[in-house]
């Protein structure tokens, strides 16, 4: 539910656009695109330090709901904006506060679940994004159709009021329900259950999922920044996020089918339900087979097929273009696998993983900034040029993922060699530590049966 509301509050401007948002605030097309992109500027600037901070304070049960209350309040305030500048400020601060959620949620899951269980759990989390597009469209359809002029407020303003209030309500309800980390959570688990949770992580990699007491606060940052695998995956994620920018404009793309506001929002929901089901099935199979590259690639190829159909057909061909929207939405199944691949590729120490998750997720959001300007109204209603850009981004993503996979294959080969030499040649272990940008202590633990998922 946190994820659903996170993305609803982030993307509701796209639905508000259909019912006078631009006209009432006297926005140009470029100004509207800037309102979409400025959220990700705040997101990027303030996200990289959030997971390490959460790792240090160890109380996500309080940290995440507090952030949720604040971003819900900011969403409500968006409804009272009068011009471009006031809307720009609310969107910027919304990005700052929402930056706490995703890396924090990913990090919590990585503390409770083993690497062979993460794909399905991450997918359930990311289905919040997919369902938010469907659920948010249905809410918007009802609000925009029935609330116009109520108490003297435009329907799009009511959309921000209602969705922001829902966010704050669920945040307060969630406080007594959320756990902390396995080693310090107090609610909902017996001491035996906490020990079992910690032992599961011990079996997964060969050590408890806790930072060494001797490690300095900046150790995780240094280890993460010196691991060049992070930069490859970051570029891949950035290209993929740019390719997924159709999500921001999905109501606009659906409206090119030629229907009214209510019908458009209702038609925008089914592709995301399909995407959610596809993502769950794909992630379940990825966990079962312990394979990442192909499970991230084939949904992107399906998305490319959707782009090609949209480029090759005219707006009058409603059936083909609507099917293409299903294919495009389904490409999210590959993006989700990329995130689980990211987490499992930087397992220990937790401080390094926290920095890696936050850094890659934050900088990959530059793709959303760029993507906000890929879909100008002048390219409509066919958006051929826009589809050409996102198609190229998906191809780039696949090629970078192939490179990343080859690096992990080589790393697994080195780990196997180091495992055979373990206890005989300390220099081999030290070399492995240097190659994997980690400490000698962690390299020794990783030698004990650990392999990167490819």
Feature locations, PLM:
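Extracytoplasmic
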Residues: 1-29, 50, 136-140, 239, ...
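Intracellular terminal tails of multi-pass secondary transporters
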Residues: 1-11, 19, 29, 175-210, ...
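Helix-breaking motifs and short loop linkers at transmembrane-helix boundaries and internal kinks
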Residues: 9, 25-26, 49, 58-59, ...
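Extracytoplasmic gate region of multi-pass secondary transporters
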Residues: 14, 219-283, 372
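Central cavity-lining transmembrane alpha-helices of secondary-active solute carriers
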Residues: 37-52, 269-281
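Conserved MFS/SLC helix-loop-helix module at the cytosolic interface between two early adjacent transmembrane helices
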Residues: 45-85
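Structural signature of the two symmetry-related core transmembrane helices
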Residues: 62-76, 294-309
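Glycine-rich segments within core transmembrane alpha-helices of 12-TM secondary carriers
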Residues: 119-152, 161-167, 357-370
């Amino acid at each position: 539910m946190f994820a659903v509301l996170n993305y609803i509050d982030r993307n509701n401007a796209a639905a508000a656009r259909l019912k006078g948002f631009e006209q009432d605030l006297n926005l140009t097309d470029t100004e509207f695109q800037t309102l979409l992109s400025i959220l990700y500027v705040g997101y990027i600037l303030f996200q990289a330090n959030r997971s390490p901070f959460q790792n240090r304070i160890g109380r996500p049960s309080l940290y995440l709901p507090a952030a949720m209350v604040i971003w819900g309040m900011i969403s409500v305030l968006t409804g009272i904006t009068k011009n471009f500048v006031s809307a720009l400020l609310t969107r910027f601060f919304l990005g700052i506060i929402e930056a706490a959620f995703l890396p924090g949620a990913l990090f919590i899951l990585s503390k409770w679940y083993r690497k062979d269980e993460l794909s399905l759990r991450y997918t359930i989390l990311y289905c919040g994004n997919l369902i938010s597009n469907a659920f948010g469209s249905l809410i918007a359809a009802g609000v925009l159709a029935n609330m116009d002029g109520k108490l003297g407020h435009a329907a799009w303003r009511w959309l921000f009021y209602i969705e922001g209030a829902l966010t704050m309500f669920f945040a307060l309800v969630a406080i007594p329900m959320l756990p902390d980390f396995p080693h310090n959570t107090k609610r909902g688990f017996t001491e035996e259950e906490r020990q079992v949770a910690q032992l599961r992580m011990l079996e997964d990699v060969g050590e408890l999922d806790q930072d060494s007491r001797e490690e300095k606060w900046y150790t995780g940052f240094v280890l993460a920044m010196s691991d060049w695998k992070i930069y490859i995956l970051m570029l891949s994620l950035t290209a993929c996020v740019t390719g997924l920018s159709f999500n921001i404009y999905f109501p606009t793309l659906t409206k090119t089918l030629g229907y009214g506001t209510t019908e458009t929002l209702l038609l925008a929901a089914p592709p995301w339900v399909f995407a959610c089901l596809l993502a769950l099935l794909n992630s379940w199979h990825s966990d079962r087979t312990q394979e990442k590259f192909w499970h991230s690639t084939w949904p992107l190829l399906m998305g490319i097929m959707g782009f090609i159909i949209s480029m090759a057909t005219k707006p009058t061909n409603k059936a083909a273009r609507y099917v293409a929207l299903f294919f495009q939405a389904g490409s999210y199944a590959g993006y989700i696998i990329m995130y689980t691949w990211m987490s499992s590729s930087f397992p220990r120490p937790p401080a390094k993983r926290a920095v890696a998750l936050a850094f890659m997720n934050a900088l990959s959001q530059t793709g959303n900034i760029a993507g906000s300007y890929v879909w100008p109204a002048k390219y409509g209603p066919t958006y051929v040029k826009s589809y050409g850009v996102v198609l190229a981004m998906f191809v780039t993503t696949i090629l970078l993922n192939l490179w990343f996979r080859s690096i992990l294959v080589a790393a697994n080969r080195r780990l196997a060699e180091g495992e055979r030499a373990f206890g005989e040649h300390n220099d081999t272990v030290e070399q492995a530590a240097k190659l994997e940008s980690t400490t000698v202590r962690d390299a020794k633990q990783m030698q004990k049966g650990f392999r990167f998922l490819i």
